[in-house]
């Protein structure tokens, strides 16, 4: 679900935290990607011309494999080294959000069934996309594909986005990539959004710098987390009637979520606290996430196993052999020499004095002669 309204608040108060660029601008970078999030995107976006998911002859869905294979190759071709991080067990507090998602899927199934044969292709497709979920089998297939491609993947003990942020904080990668804005609660130096979107969607990649974001909001780490909880996150529901502007204002006025809760309890306000609202437990999950220390994780990119890819993707999953071989060659070429250095890795940026430096007298005379 992410955090409602956080994106807009940061754009409003911390515009310098945002940058937009194309995939090629990330050349020379290593990036930790929330695998479950991008698999979900692939299952929704990678479709046949009739709107149905890709399948093999046995009727097994292959949209997730197609998306993972070709988008990863595109990154490697742009000299980007991806590492995919998979979710572990969900926190107990997330059970409520997961239950809501299940109920939404059940409702979508009822609405789709009610359409019968009278629904348009667009209507049926709308409900089918709401029914999408990433299965355990699809996760395992994605891991197998990545292994054959020579791309590292990490099994997080808990939340994938928290582990992505840990890898970024620990210097193993440049940034964490996820569509969930709550990734920022785990303090990655940079958050990348839309990284795994298809180029056909023509959406630039968004980069959000964590330090600039909280500096623009003029908040501490703790206040930022409290703001995210107040806006509504996966771990607990929001307070009815409190939107992004009000949430920001309340944090500024009261300083913490504890003080806001006390203010609501002790004063006649239009706000009602949810029953047994676990805001402090949610805060602890953001403050002390269950992750594997970055220093304990070794990331290695290897040459693809072409024979293994042919066996899995062509013989088992029904993909074109020519396309898989072509993709494997692109992987070999992209991964062969390692990550090339970026220019900003060779040059130190030095701030110049704001005052205009005095012109060299010789330069001044020369320039005057040229003008004559």
Swiss-Prot record:
Subcellular location: Nucleus, Nucleolus; Nucleus, Nucleoplasm; Mitochondrion
Any one Gene Ontology BP term: DNA replication, removal of RNA primer
Comp. bias (Basic and acidic residues): 353-366
Keyword check for DNA damage: yes
Enzyme Commission no: 3.1.-.-
Pfam families in the cross-refs: XPG_I, XPG_N
PROSITE patterns tied to this protein: XPG_1 (PS00841), XPG_2 (PS00842)
Cofactor notes: Binds 2 magnesium ions per subunit. They probably participate in the reaction catalyzed by the enzyme. May bind an additional third magnesium ion after substrate binding.
Positions bound to Mg(2+) 1: 34, 87, 159, 161
UniProt-listed InterPro entries: 5-3_exonuclease_C_sf (IPR036279), Flap_endonuc (IPR023426), HhH2 (IPR008918), PIN-like_dom_sf (IPR029060), XPG-I_dom (IPR006086), XPG/Rad2 (IPR006084), XPG_CS (IPR019974), XPG_DNA_repair_N (IPR006085)
SUPFAM superfamilies (alphabetical): 5' to 3' exonuclease, C-terminal subdomain, PIN domain-like
Coiled-coil positions: none
Keyword Protein transport found: no
GO molecular function, one term: magnesium ion binding
Binding site for DNA: 47, 71, 159, 232, 234
SMART domains: HhH2, XPGI, XPGN
Main location: nucleus
PTM comment: Phosphorylated. Phosphorylation upon DNA damage induces relocalization to the nuclear plasma.
Ranges where the record places region Interaction with PCNA: 339-347
GO CC, any one term: mitochondrion
Purpose: Structure-specific nuclease with 5'-flap endonuclease and 5'-3' exonuclease activities involved in DNA replication and repair. During DNA replication, cleaves the 5'-overhanging flap structure that is generated by displacement synthesis when DNA polymerase encounters the 5'-end of a downstream Okazaki fragment. It enters the flap from the 5'-end and then tracks to cleave the flap base, leaving a nick for ligation. Also involved in the long patch base excision repair (LP-BER) pathway, by cleaving within the apurinic/apyrimidinic (AP) site-terminated flap.
UniProt cross-references to PANTHER family, sorted A to Z: FLAP ENDONUCLEASE 1, FLAP ENDONUCLEASE FAMILY MEMBER
Family membership: Belongs to the XPG/RAD2 endonuclease family. FEN1 subfamily.
Subunit composition and interactions: Interacts with PCNA. Three molecules of RAD27 bind to one PCNA trimer with each molecule binding to one PCNA monomer. PCNA stimulates the nuclease activity without altering cleavage specificity.
Name this polypeptide is given: Flap endonuclease 1
Organism, as annotated: Candida albicans (strain WO-1)
Gene name tied to this protein: RAD27
């Amino acid at each position: 679900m992410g955090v409602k309204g956080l994106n807009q608040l940061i754009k409003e108060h911390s515009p310098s935290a945002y940058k937009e660029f194309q995939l090629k601008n990330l050349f020379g970078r290593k990036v930790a990607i929330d695998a479950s999030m991008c698999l979900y995107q692939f299952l929704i976006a990678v479709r046949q011309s009739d709107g149905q998911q890709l399948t093999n002859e046995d009727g097994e869905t292959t949209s997730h494999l197609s998306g993972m294979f070709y988008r990863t190759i595109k990154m490697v071709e742009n000299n980007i080294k991806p590492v995919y991080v998979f979710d572990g067990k969900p926190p107990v507090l997330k059970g409520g959000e997961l239950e809501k998602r299940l109920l939404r899927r059940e409702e979508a199934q009822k609405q789709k069934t009610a359409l019968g044969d009278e629904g348009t292709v667009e209507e049926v497709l709308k409900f089918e996309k709401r029914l999408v979920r990433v299965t355990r089998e699809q996760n395992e297939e994605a891991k197998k594909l990545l292994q054959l491609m020579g791309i590292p993947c990490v099994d997080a003990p808990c939340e994938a986005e928290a582990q992505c942020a840990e890898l970024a904080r620990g210097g193993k990668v440049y940034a964490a990539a996820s569509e969930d804005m709550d990734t920022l609660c785990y303090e990655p130096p940079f958050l990348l959004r839309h990284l795994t979107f298809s180029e056909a969607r023509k959406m630039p990649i968004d980069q959000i710098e964590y330090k600039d974001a909280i500096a623009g909001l003029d908040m501490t780490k703790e206040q930022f987390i409290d703001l995210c909880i107040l806006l509504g996150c996966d771990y607990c529901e929001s307070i009815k009637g409190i939107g992004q502007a009000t949430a920001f204002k309340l944090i500024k006025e009261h300083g913490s979520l504890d003080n806001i809760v006390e203010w609501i309890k002790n004063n006649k306000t239009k706000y009602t606290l949810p029953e047994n609202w676990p805001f402090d437990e949610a805060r602890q999950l953001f403050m002390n996430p269950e992750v594997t220390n970055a220093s304990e994780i070794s990331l290695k990119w290897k040459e693809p196993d072409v024979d293994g890819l042919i066996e899995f993707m062509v013989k088992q999953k029904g993909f074109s052999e020519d396309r898989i071989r072509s993709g494997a060659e692109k992987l070999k070429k992209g991964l062969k020499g390692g990550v090339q250095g970026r220019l900003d890795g060779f040059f130190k940026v030095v701030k110049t004095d704001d005052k205009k430096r005095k012109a060299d007298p010789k330069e001044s005379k020369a320039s005057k002669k040229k003008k004559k």
